[in-house]
Regions:
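Selective for proline/serine-rich intrinsically disordered segments
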Residues: 1-4, 11-14, 298, 303, ...
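Linear, non-domain "peripheral" regions
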Residues: 2-78, 95-102
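His-Asp-centered catalytic microenvironments across diverse enzyme cores
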Residues: 27-40, 61-84, 102, 147-160, ...
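A near-ubiquitous, low-amplitude feature marking generic local secondary-structure context
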Residues: 43-47, 81, 110-113, 117
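Active-site neighborhood of thiol-dependent amide/isopeptide-bond enzymes
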Residues: 87-160
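Substrate/cofactor-recognition hotspot
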Residues: 295-325
Length: 325
């Protein structure tokens, strides 16, 4: 556990009391909520690194994209990164990430970095760094967990992106801070990474609803088609992402391999009803945040506990991790 991480509570006491106005639009209370740092995104003593960043989310996305090398897709070992550095994937807090990034290369975050000068991580890490940058500028921004269609044709791949409030257009945009400007999918499609449409990124709630309705095949949802681990595909992965997305909407941006009772339970009829209600509240890019926060606060099974079980994507044993004290 990082002792320097700021205190917070899983009951989310900082959630605003304001709600959605009569037109269904996000009010200033919730915009302010998402414009402030969470326990995970707080830069702490490294806050100075976020000074002087670009003032718009498009440029911020480019900065965040240049800080992470993906632990699988980026082939870090082939770039000469020592195997012991693979444990950087467990960097839970932005303060920890920024500290390590300055060790790898001193100077502003906007500078170009070689693969060896980037932090080994995944989409979640690009996202929380992007969140920290946006929130430092007062931009309302939050993480969303779901499935991308632009990595492996025909499959929905486990992924985390950001959702940014566009003040000019008065709407939320799904933005992927983990792919480069020149990224093209394997089937030759260029991705609208600054405004992902539903056919490119399916929110976990929508994935759950479509699979429950029979309009999508749950066997197409997974971490990686080449990964033959039962819990990383089909219903277990969809359920896991659904619970992770609820936590993210409550500004509790966990590692993607963190699990707790709400994400790994054996499903009963009661559980299915609960998850159906959860999917109903989180399946859109403009959910009723008052209901989302209330759902999280009222159901202990869905809340992230102080101690979680963190699985090891590198193949090691699971570990109990206390992230909240």
């Amino acid at each position: 556990m990082d002792p320097s991480a700021p205190e917070c509570s899983t009951s989310n006491p900082t959630a605003p009391k304001a709600g959605i106005d009569q037109d269904g639009e996000m009010d200033s209370g919730y915009l302010s909520y998402y414009a402030t740092q969470s326990r995970m995104t707080d830069p702490g003593r490294m806050a100075g690194l976020l000074d002087g960043l670009p003032k718009n989310f498009a440029a911020l996305r480019q900065v965040a994209c240049g800080l992470i090398i993906h632990y699988r897709g980026g082939n870090p070992l082939q770039h000469g990164i020592p195997a012991e550095r693979m444990r950087e994937i467990d960097s839970r807090y932005v303060e920890t990430m920024l500290t390590r990034l300055t060790e790898l290369k001193d100077g502003p975050l906007t500078g170009l970095r070689s693969p060896k000068e980037k932090l080994v991580g995944c989409c979640r890490d690009s996202t929380v760094l992007f969140l920290a940058m946006g929130r430092a500028l007062g931009i309302p921004i939050r993480a969303r967990v779901g499935f991308a269609t632009y990595f492996v044709p025909g499959y929905y791949i486990d992924h985390e992106v950001a959702e940014v409030w566009d003040a000019e257009e008065q709407r939320w945009r799904l933005v992927d801070p983990g792919i480069g400007d020149d990224f093209v999918s394997r089937d030759g499609v260029r991705v609208s990474y600054l405004d992902l449409p539903p056919e490119s990124f399916l929110l976990a709630g929508s994935a759950w609803q479509q699979c429950r309705a029979g309009t999508a095949d749950p066997e197409k949802f997974m971490v990686d088609p080449g990964l033959e681990v039962e819990d990383t595909r089909s219903w277990p992965q969809i359920r896991h992402n659904l619970v992770q997305d609820l936590a993210a909407l409550n500004k509790t941006e966990m590692l993607l391999w963190d699990t707790w009772s709400g994400s790994q339970q054996t499903l009963t009829d009661r559980d299915l009803d609960r998850l159906d209600r959860l999917a109903e509240q989180t399946s859109a890019t403009n959910p009723d945040i008052a209901k989302v926060i209330r759902l999280y606060q009222d159901d202990p099974e869905l809340q992230v506990p102080a101690t979680v079980v963190s699985e090891d994507p590198l193949g090691g044993p699971c570990r109990e991790v206390t992230w909240l004290s």
